[in-house]
């Protein structure tokens, strides 16, 4: 009698969020164009990122807006992630994964994303994409009421598990480098 091995549903990984960041490095017209571009690409209103400290060499003051970012969750995150992965050819370097299951990679030009056209008024921007993976039940440690401790074996997502998740769900090829 062959027994089928069941997988614990609480051990399955899921996509928590996709964070998209465009760092401009200065306030002004380019920052407004990056804001407009990110809003068009994602359909979500971006937030401004501000400088943590003054860097005189770059002309950046503490508290000045220097970039825009968007956090996507749920279906929007999956749809945008599929588009962005198509822009990089469904290939991610192994060095893009950290030991907690997060993945980060960059896109040199937003025009590489399928369905995006070049607009001379906006110009060309690069962007950083960060993917966060979690297990179900992770909210227990973050919620406001009745917080509880989550064991380390459930809390951490290994690099190998994250790679396998992206291979299975998004047809990603992991490249050494």
UniProtKB/Swiss-Prot annotation:
SUPFAM superfamilies: RL5-like (SSF55282). One of its GO terms (biological process) is translation. Transmembrane segments: none annotated. Keywords: Ribonucleoprotein, Ribosomal protein, RNA-binding, rRNA-binding, tRNA-binding. GO terms for cellular component: ribonucleoprotein complex; ribosome. Signal peptide: none annotated. GO terms for molecular function: rRNA binding; structural constituent of ribosome; tRNA binding. The keyword Lipid metabolism does not apply. It comes from the Archaea. It holds the Pfam family Ribosomal_L5. InterPro entries: Ribosomal_uL5, Ribosomal_uL5_arc, Ribosomal_uL5_C, Ribosomal_uL5_CS, Ribosomal_uL5_dom_sf, Ribosomal_uL5_N. HAMAP family: Ribosomal_uL5_A (MF_01333_A). Belongs to the universal ribosomal protein uL5 family. Part of the 50S ribosomal subunit; contacts the 5S rRNA and probably tRNA. Forms a bridge to the 30S subunit in the 70S ribosome. NCBIfam families: PRK04219.1. This is one of the proteins that bind and probably mediate the attachment of the 5S RNA into the large ribosomal subunit, where it forms part of the central protuberance. In the 70S ribosome it contacts protein S13 of the 30S subunit (bridge B1b), connecting the 2 subunits; this bridge is implicated in subunit movement. May contact the P site tRNA; the 5S rRNA and some of its associated proteins might help stabilize positioning of ribosome-bound tRNAs. This is Large ribosomal subunit protein uL5. It comes from Sulfurisphaera tokodaii (strain DSM 16993 / JCM 10545 / NBRC 100140 / 7) (Sulfolobus tokodaii).
């Amino acid at each position: 009698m062959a027994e089928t091995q069941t997988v614990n549903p609480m051990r399955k990984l899921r996509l928590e969020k996709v964070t998209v960041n465009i760092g401009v490095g200065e306030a002004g017209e380019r920052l407004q164009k990056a804001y407009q571009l990110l809003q068009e690409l994602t359909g979500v209103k971006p937030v401004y990122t501000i400088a943590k400290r003054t860097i005189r060499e770059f002309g950046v003051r503490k508290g000045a807006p220097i970039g825009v970012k968007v956090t996507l969750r749920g279906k929007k995150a999956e749809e945008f992630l599929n588009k962005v992965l198509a822009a990089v050819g469904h290939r991610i370097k192994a060095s893009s994964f950290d030991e907690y299951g997060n993945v980060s990679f960059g896109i040199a030009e937003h025009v590489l994303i399928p369905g995006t056209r070049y607009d001379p008024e906006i110009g060309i921007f690069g962007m950083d994409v960060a993917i966060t993976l979690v297990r179900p039940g992770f909210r227990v440690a973050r919620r406001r009421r009745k917080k509880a401790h989550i064991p380390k074996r459930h809390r951490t997502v290994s690099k190998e598990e994250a790679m396998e998740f992206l291979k299975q769900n998004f047809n990603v090829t992991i490249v050494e480098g």
